[in-house]
Swiss-Prot record:
Gene3D superfamilies: Spore Coat Polysaccharide Biosynthesis Protein SpsA, Chain A
Metabolic or biological pathway: Isoprenoid biosynthesis; isopentenyl diphosphate biosynthesis via DXP pathway; isopentenyl diphosphate from 1-deoxy-D-xylulose 5-phosphate: step 2/6
HAMAP family per record: IspD (MF_00108)
Entry protein name: 2-C-methyl-D-erythritol 4-phosphate cytidylyltransferase
Function: Catalyzes the formation of 4-diphosphocytidyl-2-C-methyl-D-erythritol from CTP and 2-C-methyl-D-erythritol 4-phosphate (MEP).
Lineage of the species this protein comes from: Bacteria, Bacillati, Actinomycetota, Actinomycetes, Mycobacteriales
Length: 241
């Protein structure tokens, strides 16, 4: 898939089971006021005005459903496009599958920047997406939105014994979308033999593991991750306020 030079492509890994939500279906396909989380996430990215194309990775048996829903939702939206691909066994592999649809950084048509966004952060406001892209265009090669912590954090061992209490002032709760210069993210995933040996919970961790510098920008409370039934209830209340 070729895109115009200088563009921003967002990748949405949405193939996970989401067992903590206990909905009986993949989490990204839970509905929030009649629209699935993945639909809300994809449309939110495109409507931000700074994302040119979205590649969403879903379970193989959900491809047709996702294509139909997005085609209906974007039918009257000029210049807004999404590609649906089969995801992998975990988040990292789903991102790999999505990246494989894009031209390599050295090829004509490669995007300038890539965002990676959780489908479960379905209420992420446009202002946060813009903030991440603005930081990329300002010269940072890896950008994550994050919020200060309000809770005290304890490090514990396997038996639940407290090992220490890190200073909260230097800690942040990281959100998505996370943004990267295309070449940096591409190289991180291409150096792939190590991917199965380390549990990377986000893409910035992978970049850090390879020595990359990651810039934090202000996050947004509305970009919370819908992981449990309580989160889903909160999201519904926010939409209906």
């Amino acid at each position: 898939m070729a895109v115009a030079t200088g563009t921003v492509v967002a990748v949405v890994p949405a193939a996970g089971a989401g067992k903590r939500l206990a909905a009986g279906i993949p989490k990204a396909f839970c509905e929030l006021d009649g629209r699935t989380l993945v639909e809300r996430a994809v449309v939110g990215l495109l409507e931000s005005g700074v994302v040119d194309h979205v590649v969403v990775a879903v379970p193989a048996d959900r491809i047709a459903q996702t294509q139909w829903v997005l085609s209906q939702r974007l039918a009257n939206s000029a210049g807004q496009h999404a590609t649906v691909v089969a995801g992998g066994a975990d988040r990292t592999k789903s991102v790999c599958q999505a990246l494989a649809t894009l031209p390599a950084p050295s090829r004509v048509g490669a995007p300038e920047f890539i965002l990676v966004h959780d489908a479960a952060r379905a209420l992420t406001p446009a202002r946060l997406i813009v903030r991440v892209v603005d930081a990329l265009r300002a010269g940072h090669t890896a950008v994550v939105p994050a919020l200060p912590l309000s809770d005290t954090i304890k490090a514990v061992d396997a038996n639940g014994m407290v090992l220490g209490t890190p200073a909260r002032v230097g800690l942040r709760a990281v959100q998505t979308p996370q943004g990267f210069a295309t070449e940096l993210l591409w190289c991180a995933y291409q150096r792939g033999p190590h991917l199965d040996a380390v549990d990377f919970t986000d893409d910035a961790s992978l970049v850090e593991h390879l020595g990359g510098q990651v810039q934090v920008v202000a996050g947004d409370p509305l970009a919370f991750k819908i992981t449990t039934q309580l989160d889903l209830l909160l999201a519904k209340k926010i939409l209906r306020r």
